[in-house]
A protein has these predicted regions:
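Short alpha-helical segments enriched in small residues
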Residues: 1-157
């Protein structure tokens, strides 16, 4: 069973819903969830927020934070996760933001520097990844790590 299938199974078992907010993964997280038969029982939907304006308007990410630090930081990942969870009224959410490569971004973040976040009603956990593969492999690894984070967070009391 792959990471997405395991995550969907855990969500079903716990009767929880999921929403996603994606930047660097560009919808891959949502695609992997919806590849799982029966995922409609738990997956509400997602926001692909590549542009700062979308992060601000749809997810409630602080504009000043984006201007000062750029989108590749723990605080933005956390705000994305909390924002999509609230906006879609989900029990739990996942968010991804970072630089998948191949070049650096406007704030010169390293290629492979990606932040993933998982928000529940009671907390939001952010994890930094430092990946070193191709763009596609970095995006896939970020998704796998996000699903693993979700599983860990749902095991916590």
């Amino acid at each position: 069973m792959n990471e997405a299938a395991r995550a969907v199974a855990v969500l079903k078992e716990k009767r929880l819903t999921l929403a996603t907010a994606e930047s660097c993964t560009g919808g891959l997280l949502g695609k992997l969830v919806t590849d799982v038969p029966g995922s409609s029982a738990v997956y509400l939907g997602g926001v692909i927020s590549y542009a700062y304006a979308v992060k601000e308007r749809l997810l409630g990410v602080d504009a000043a934070l984006l201007q000062e630090q750029g989108a590749v930081c723990a605080a933005v990942a956390g705000q994305m996760a909390r924002g999509v969870r609230a906006r879609l009224q989900a029990d739990v959410s996942l968010a991804t933001t970072g630089n998948a490569g191949p070049g650096t971004d406007e704030k010169n973040h390293k290629v492979g520097e990606i932040f993933i976040a998982c928000a529940t009603k009671s907390r939001c956990t952010v994890q930094k990844l430092e990946l070193s593969s191709s763009r596609g492999e970095n995006r896939a690894a970020a998704c796998a790590a996000a699903f693993a984070l979700l599983e860990r967070e749902l095991e916590e009391p």
